[in-house]
């Protein structure tokens, strides 16, 4: 029961991220537009007082403001998409339902343009419809209902004479009906709910605001590992608290009030549930990253410097803290608990200093400048001394606790030597052991690049052991582990499956003498190998491939290729070494011994071969320009995250990769030179 509820809450939390992701763009427009109209910036840049520039500034402010004015509708559509696996039909259904519910509530309650502006009534004009104000909560309810209608009716069958309305077309019809019915209980009970929310928020904020902001920061931080923080902070940002703007409209929610006050140039009173992030994200966590680097083992410091440096810069600039927090969360929970306490105290300190700062994305430097420094409506400079003090506290507390309790933070892990000499026959047994054993495996799968395992308890997984076994990287997404073993991943998965079924047993240990050692054949490498485009399309840097396994070169170096049509051809003369059963990837070896992986699309293993037609088989001889595969590009575009096709050289070794300065290419056009200087 609890696990099911927890899973549902996680899904809702993730669904909220889509509408929230729109806010930074809106905030950027609004903040820059407002700053350009403000006296502070005009004092330093008098030329922006030009009439044309001011007109642009007004348009930017209006463009950003319209997003915040219609947040409930955006949340309705965003939540629907998030809970319906990204299908746009759910968003259309949510839009239809939102209109129907508001129009019906307005008619039922006799709301008119004459009484809609009476703030005490709880009415509002929504998309020009005089109705009951349900705010973001109303949008979330409609979004969840639209997702339910989609998941329930998207594949419904109807009699042949009604066949046009079958399937997904039936979803908006059902949504219009259900939202019409929903409008009546909403009109009846929502005023009481809104009154209760207002009373709760007023009591929370007026009775002991300091305690409230501390607990908000503390609890929100503790919920991050569970992915529930989005659900927790949504009421505070979008519903709790009330403020009447110049037009007489009642604005609810700390973030919405803050943005409205920035837009109007009013005195700032909001930001209590956002401002505490700035000292932590801009100063505290980067200092914690420095402590982790300084406590790493000397031989690991170079690697840790890159890891922690990137995470610290991300936290400082954007306020995205997960890469840094998850580096110590599981190995040192005490550090995370201390971090949560310090986060709560940061909210309390800035509240006591009467600072009012907010953001549209997170508490990083970008939002700090746009919504704090440029508007110049609060004592934004106080964040700096508070942040400097926080940097010292984070650094010395983290350093002391890491050394005192010998936490295995990045760079301090124990080496796992017991698996490094695994033979091919022992490897699946050892990988299974590193995954926590057979009893810890919930679901087992693989693609041509990685082993995908859903485990019951992530704490039982030996990540260092997996790397020692040959995994070039291990990704953790919830309880889903992805171990990057390259092309042998599918074989490991196959063998692990047989082991779990009891069909194969661990081989006996044998002693190998020197006389039995294998003969090593040395192949002379060519000084230069050319790789040509595998079709018509575009070439992009590997770093832009939307999959960090490829983008971070865990599989090898290369480029990304975006096919323009469905024909995939051989990029050189050579041999087909591997074709994955689902046909989404093919491994080739050139006549000069260079190994190339062509991975068509991202996460296309889940398509189970649908949309792929192969014209070659393993061990076939191929020539440059020969058709290897025909793909249904429309199908892949609709059912996979991306059609970007990584071209990965898996045995580059000490050779140099030279990518041609090209973008739009045709089949058989030179795109890569691999040069051997030896």
UniProtKB/Swiss-Prot annotation:
InterPro entries: Dup_hybrid_motif, Glu_permease_IIB, PTrfase_EIIB_Cys, PTS_EIIA_1_perm, PTS_EIIC, PTS_EIIC_1, PTS_Glucose_EIICBA, PTS_IIB_1. PROSITE patterns: PTS_EIIA_TYPE_1 (PS51093), PTS_EIIA_TYPE_1_HIS (PS00371), PTS_EIIB_TYPE_1 (PS51098), PTS_EIIB_TYPE_1_CYS (PS01035), PTS_EIIC_TYPE_1 (PS51103). Residues 3-414 form the PTS EIIC type-1 domain. The chain crosses the membrane at residues 16-36, 63-83, 89-109, 126-146, 170-190, 211-231, 273-293, 303-323, 329-349, 355-375, 382-402. GO terms for biological process: D-glucose transmembrane transport; phosphoenolpyruvate-dependent sugar phosphotransferase system. GO terms for cellular component: plasma membrane. It catalyses: N(pros)-phospho-L-histidyl-[protein] + D-glucose(out) = D-glucose 6-phosphate(in) + L-histidyl-[protein]. Residues 425-506 form the PTS EIIB type-1 domain. The active site is at residues 447, 599. It is a multi-pass membrane protein. Residues 547-651 form the PTS EIIA type-1 domain. One of its GO terms (molecular function) is kinase activity. Its main location: membrane. Gene3D superfamilies: Glucose Permease (Domain IIA), Glucose permease domain IIB. It is found in: Cell membrane. Its EC number is 2.7.1.199. It is an enzyme of class 2 (transferase). The phosphoenolpyruvate-dependent sugar phosphotransferase system (sugar PTS), a major carbohydrate active transport system, catalyzes the phosphorylation of incoming sugar substrates concomitantly with their translocation across the cell membrane. This system is involved in glucose transport. The EIIC domain forms the PTS system translocation channel and contains the specific substrate-binding site. The EIIB domain is phosphorylated by phospho-EIIA on a cysteinyl or histidyl residue, depending on the transported sugar. Then, it transfers the phosphoryl group to the sugar substrate concomitantly with the sugar uptake processed by the EIIC domain. This is PTS system glucose-specific EIICBA component. It comes from Staphylococcus saprophyticus subsp. saprophyticus (strain ATCC 15305 / DSM 20229 / NCIMB 8711 / NCTC 7292 / S-41).
């Amino acid at each position: 029961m609890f696990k099911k509820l927890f899973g549902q809450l996680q899904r809702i939390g993730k669904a909220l991220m889509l509408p929230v992701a729109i806010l930074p763009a809106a905030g950027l427009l609004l903040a820059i537009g407002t700053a350009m109209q403000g006296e502070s910036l005009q004092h330093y840049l008098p030329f922006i007082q030009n009439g044309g520039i001011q007109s642009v500034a007004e348009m930017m402010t209006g463009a950003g403001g319209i997003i915040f004015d219609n947040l409930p509708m955006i949340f309705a559509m965003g939540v629907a998409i998030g809970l319906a696996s990204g299908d746009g039909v759910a968003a259309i259904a949510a839009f239809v339902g939102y209109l129907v519910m508001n129009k019906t509530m307005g008619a039922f309650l006799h709301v008119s343009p004459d009484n809609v502006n009476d703030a005490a009534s709880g009415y509002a004009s929504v998309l020009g419809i005089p109705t009951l104000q349900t705010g973001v909560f109303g949008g979330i309810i409609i979004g969840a209902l639209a997702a339910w209608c989609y998941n329930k009716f998207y594949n419904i069958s109807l009699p042949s004479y009604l066949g046009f309305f079958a399937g997904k077309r039936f979803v908006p019809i059902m949504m219009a009906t259900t939202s019409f019915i929903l409008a009546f209980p909403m009109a009846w009970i929502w005023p009481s709910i809104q009154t209760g929310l207002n009373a709760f928020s007023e009591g929370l904020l007026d009775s002991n605001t300091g305690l409230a902001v501390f607990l908000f920061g503390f609890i929100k931080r503790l919920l991050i590992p569970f992915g529930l923080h989005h659900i927790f902070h949504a009421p505070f940002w979008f519903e709790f608290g009330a403020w009447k703007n110049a037009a007489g409209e009642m604005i609810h929610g700390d973030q919405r009030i803050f943005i409205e006050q920035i837009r109007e140039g009013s005195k700032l009173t909001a930001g209590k549930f956002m401002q505490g992030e700035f000292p932590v994200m801009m100063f505290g966590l980067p200092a914690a990253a420095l402590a982790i680097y300084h406590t790493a083992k000397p031989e690991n410091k170079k690697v840790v410097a890159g890891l922690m440096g990137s995470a610290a810069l991300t936290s400082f600039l954007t306020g995205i803290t997960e890469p840094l927090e998850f580096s110590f969360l599981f190995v040192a929970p005490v550090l995370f608990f201390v971090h949560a306490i310090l986060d709560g105290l940061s909210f309390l300190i800035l509240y006591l200093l009467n600072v009012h700062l907010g953001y549209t994305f997170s508490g990083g430097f970008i939002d700090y400048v746009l919504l704090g420094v440029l508007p110049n409506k609060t004592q934004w400079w106080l964040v700096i001394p508070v942040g400097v003090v926080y940097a010292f506290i984070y650094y010395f507390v983290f350093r002391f606790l890491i050394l005192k309790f010998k936490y295995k933070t990045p760079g301090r892990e124990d080496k796992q030597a017991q698996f490094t000499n695994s033979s091919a026959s022992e490897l699946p047994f050892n990988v299974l052991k590193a995954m926590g054993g057979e009893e810890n495996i919930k679901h087992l799968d693989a693609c041509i690049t990685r082993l995908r395992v859903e485990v019951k308890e992530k704490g039982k997984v030996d990540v260092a052991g997996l790397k020692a076994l040959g995994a070039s990287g291990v990704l953790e997404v919830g309880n889903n582990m992805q171990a990057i073993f390259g092309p042998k991943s599918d074989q490991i998965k196959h063998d692990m499956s047989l082991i779990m079924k009891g069909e194969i047993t661990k081989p006996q240990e044998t002693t190998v003498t020197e006389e039995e050692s294998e003969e090593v054949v040395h192949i002379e490498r060519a000084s230069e190998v050319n790789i040509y485009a595998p079709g018509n399309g575009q070439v992009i840097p590997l770093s832009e491939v939307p999959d960090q396994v490829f983008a971070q070169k865990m599989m090898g170096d290369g480029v990304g290729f975006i096919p323009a049509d469905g024909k995939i051809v051989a990029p050189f003369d050579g041999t087909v070494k591997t074709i994955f059963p689902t046909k989404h990837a093919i491994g080739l070896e050139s006549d000069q011994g260079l190994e190339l992986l062509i991975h068509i699309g991202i996460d296309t293993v889940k398509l189970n071969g649908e949309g792929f037609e192969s014209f070659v088989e393993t061990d076939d001889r191929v020539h440059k320009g020969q058709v290897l595969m025909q793909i249904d590009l429309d199908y892949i575009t609709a059912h996979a995250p991306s059609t970007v096709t990584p071209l990965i050289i898996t045995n580059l070794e000490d050779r140099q990769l030279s990518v041609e300065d090209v973008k739009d290419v045709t089949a058989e056009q030179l795109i890569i030179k691999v040069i051997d200087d030896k």
